[in-house]
């Protein structure tokens, strides 16, 4: 814990370690999935007002249109609300949010915050073979705030090869915890999706957090393995009729309540991130994030 933290920040961080994070998250998850009529509508209305959510871009625009808080939180946008960049030489932002960190994976390490790194191997579930294709590559970490659109889309065309569920803690994910909780993204519960692309391998890691009720993918629905410490893996065919393929901008998952998406890219996939992209940059789904290094393909 940084000595520069205020007393209130130190209390908040200490509370993160001692509070029953899983129990709280399960309770919130049940409430978020409950159909409570007028009370649900009231809570959604309060949430919209508190966070200044722009419902004009949502397909369903009124609080009363949603029968559960989860359905509101994972709301669909109306057609045309986000334009997906169609340049095959770029990748696009996969979510609305804000960049926490981005850069090179050096000696197997990703930057979490100043003074804190974590390993790509631990992030992807502890298997060195899974992590090997990303050694020397690049990474991006984007935080989704409560006000953001919470569906996750593909930054480029790809074919799903593997999904990994990694059990773990449920620390809150925000700038304060990123700067004070070591290995935050590699110790929280998460779902890892490994893809093949024409440029190499891509991993998208959907990181859970306190009160994140659940994580969904478009191919497997809500990920709910048995409680415990076991890591679960699912393999998928690379080709043929059963292959699961995505075009750039296709939805691949969603958070029921929000958190963070960490993406790792194989070496020589990305030539450079956009000049206006960096820690703190607000991201908008579909806009150009980085240039692909086509010279290496």
UniProtKB/Swiss-Prot annotation:
Pathway: Phospholipid metabolism; phosphatidylethanolamine biosynthesis; phosphatidylethanolamine from CDP-diacylglycerol: step 2/2. Its cofactor is pyruvate. GO terms for biological process: phosphatidylethanolamine biosynthetic process. This is Phosphatidylserine decarboxylase proenzyme. The record marks 258-259 as: Cleavage (non-hydrolytic). It is found in: Cell membrane. It is a peripheral membrane protein. The keyword Lipid metabolism applies. The gene is psd. GO terms for molecular function: phosphatidylserine decarboxylase activity. It catalyses: a 1,2-diacyl-sn-glycero-3-phospho-L-serine + H(+) = a 1,2-diacyl-sn-glycero-3-phosphoethanolamine + CO2. PANTHER family: PHOSPHATIDYLSERINE DECARBOXYLASE (PTHR10067), PHOSPHATIDYLSERINE DECARBOXYLASE PROENZYME, MITOCHONDRIAL (PTHR10067:SF6). Heterodimer of a large membrane-associated beta subunit and a small pyruvoyl-containing alpha subunit. Binds 1 pyruvoyl group covalently per subunit. Pfam families: PS_Dcarbxylase.
């Amino acid at each position: 814990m940084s000595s520069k933290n205020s007393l209130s920040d130190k209390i908040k961080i200490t509370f993160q370690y001692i509070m029953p994070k899983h129990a709280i998250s399960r309770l919130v998850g049940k409430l978020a999935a409950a159909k409570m009529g007028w009370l649900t509508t009231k809570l959604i209305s309060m949430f919209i007002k508190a966070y200044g959510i722009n419902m004009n871009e949502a397909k369903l625009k009124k609080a009363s249109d949603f029968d559960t808080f989860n359905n509101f939180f994972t709301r669909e946008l109306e057609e045309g609300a986000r334009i997906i960049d169609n340049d095959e030489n770029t990748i696009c932002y996969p979510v609305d949010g804000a960049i926490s960190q981005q850069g090179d994976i050096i000696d197997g390490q990703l930057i979490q915050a100043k003074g804190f790194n974590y390993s790509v191997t631990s992030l992807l579930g502890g298997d060195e073979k899974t992590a090997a294709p990303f050694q020397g590559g690049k990474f991006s970490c984007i935080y989704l705030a409560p006000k953001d659109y919470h569906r996750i889309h593909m930054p480029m065309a790809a074919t799903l090869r593997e999904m990994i569920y990694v059990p773990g803690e449920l620390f809150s994910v925000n700038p304060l915890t990123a700067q004070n909780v070591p290995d935050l993204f590699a110790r929280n519960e998460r779902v890892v999706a490994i893809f093949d692309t024409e440029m190499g391998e891509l991993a998208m890691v959907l990181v859970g957090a306190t009160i994140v009720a659940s994580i969904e993918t478009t191919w497997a629905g809500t990920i709910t393995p048995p409680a415990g410490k076991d890591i679960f893996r699912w393999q998928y065919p690379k080709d043929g009729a059963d292959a699961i393929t995505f075009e750039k901008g296709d939805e691949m998952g969603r958070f029921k309540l929000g958190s963070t998406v960490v993406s790792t890219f194989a070496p020589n996939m990305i030539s450079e991130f956009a000049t206006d992209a960096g820690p703190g940059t607000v991201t908008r789904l579909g806009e150009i994030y980085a240039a692909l290094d086509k010279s290496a393909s």
